[in-house]
A protein has these predicted regions:
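Membrane-anchoring alpha-helices and their flanking helix-loop junctions
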Residues: 1-82, 97-207
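Glycine-rich acyl-CoA binding loop
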Residues: 83-86, 90-94
């Protein structure tokens, strides 16, 4: 975003505001469909696990700086520019994308990867526009300067100099423990789907 240039007008982020509270449900439904038709392969399974672990580590780093990241946008009280936010503006969404790619690898359905990436861009593109409009309205010039200096997804080499925000470990237990348990269960289910008792689904589904 060029320095001094206004970001999206709040009215242009209406779709994103509608999708924002339902993003977890949307990914859950898509994941369930992929699981049913999955054909896990050992060659792809463990790289998929590695992607999920890497994405979750980034989530843990990022979520520790955002005290209300699971709440509505209106609960945001400060513009956080420390930690991973000093390098890119959307580390949580990047982490979700990495995790999503990992789940596709677990499934063994490589043709689902471009479908996932397309859905990711459509969903988070709308959400990010809504968030940017809200943050610009709330924090004004401070956010415009930050957005002009820090990319959305491609990390900058050096951290943003005007860093603000602290890491709160307690947030990880309060907000991220469910994600950790869910991802562990996802890996287990896909393992059983491909190499254990849940292979019976192939016969039930006629695959």
């Amino acid at each position: 975003v060029p320095s001094g240039r206004a970001l999206a007008h709040p009215r242009k982020g209406k779709i994103g505001k509608v999708l924002f509270p339902h993003r977890g449900t949307i990914w859950g439904v898509m994941g369930a469909v992929v699981f049913l038709f999955a054909h896990p392969q050992a060659l792809l399974f463990w790289p998929g696990v590695s992607c999920i672990l890497g994405g979750e580590l980034l989530r843990l780093w990022a979520s520790g700086y955002i005290k209300t990241y699971r709440g509505p946008m209106e609960e945001v009280e400060e513009l956080v520019t420390s930690g991973p936010y000093a390098y890119l503006r959307n580390p949580l969404y990047l982490a979700n994308g990495i995790i999503g790619c990992g789940v596709v690898l677990l499934s063994g359905i490589l043709w689902a990867l471009p479908l996932f990436l397309g859905s990711f861009v459509l969903l988070y593109g709308s959400i990010i526009r809504a968030e940017e409009a809200f943050l610009e309205e709330k924090f004004g010039a401070a956010y415009r300067e930050y957005a002009a200096s820090v990319p959305r997804f491609v990390p900058r080499l050096l951290p943003y100099p005007k860093r603000k925000g602290t890491f709160a470990p307690k947030v990880l237990w309060e907000k991220e423990s469910t994600t950790l348990l869910t991802l562990g269960l996802v890996v287990l289910l896909f393992y059983l789907r491909g190499f254990g008792v849940l292979r019976v689904l192939d016969r039930l589904l006629g695959l």
